[in-house]
Amino acid sequence: MAQQPVVAIVTGASRGAGRGIAVALGSHGCTVYVTGRSENEGDAEVPGTIHATAREVTEAGGQGIAVKCDHADDAQVKALVDRVIAEQGRIDILVNNACWQGNVMNA
C-alpha cells in the first residue's frame, strides 16, 4: 500500500517564517495548503503571495495549494478546513503563523 503524503496547512505563508516552513514541508513531499490574504503582488506593503509560495512548495517536491483566507474571519477558516477535509480526508499538520502586520498608530 502506497504511503499517502502528509497534509499540512500553513497560515500566513505568503512570506517570512510561514513561507519558509511551507517550502520546507514541500521538500519532504508534503501536500501543503498555503494560506494568506496576498494573492497578487501589491496586495500588501511587503512582497510575497500565496501563489508564489505554492509554486515554491511544488518546485521543492511537494504539492503546493494556494488558498486565500483571512484568518480573522471564522467563516473563511471553516471553509478552508472543510475544503482540506473534503479533498484530503484529514489534516496532519497545522502551522498557525497568520498575523497582522501594520502600524498600530494607524489601526
Feature locations, PLM:
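Canonical Rossmann dinucleotide-binding motif of NAD(H)/NADP(H)-dependent dehydrogenases/reductases
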Residues: 2-39
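A glycine-rich helix->loop->beta "capping" turn
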Residues: 3, 60-65, 83-96, 102-103
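Rossmann-fold scaffold of SDR-type NAD(P)-dependent oxidoreductases
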Residues: 11, 35, 69, 91-99
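Generic hydrophobic, amphipathic alpha-helix propensity
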Residues: 17, 50-53, 57
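Glycine/Thr-rich phosphate-binding loops of Rossmann-like dinucleotide-binding domains
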Residues: 18, 41-43, 104-105
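N-terminal Rossmann-fold cofactor-binding loop
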Residues: 35-47, 71
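Conserved mid-core segment of classical short-chain dehydrogenase/reductases
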Residues: 46-51, 78, 99-107
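The beta1-alpha1 cofactor-binding region of Rossmann-like NAD(H)/NADP(H)-dependent oxidoreductases
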Residues: 48-51, 67-82
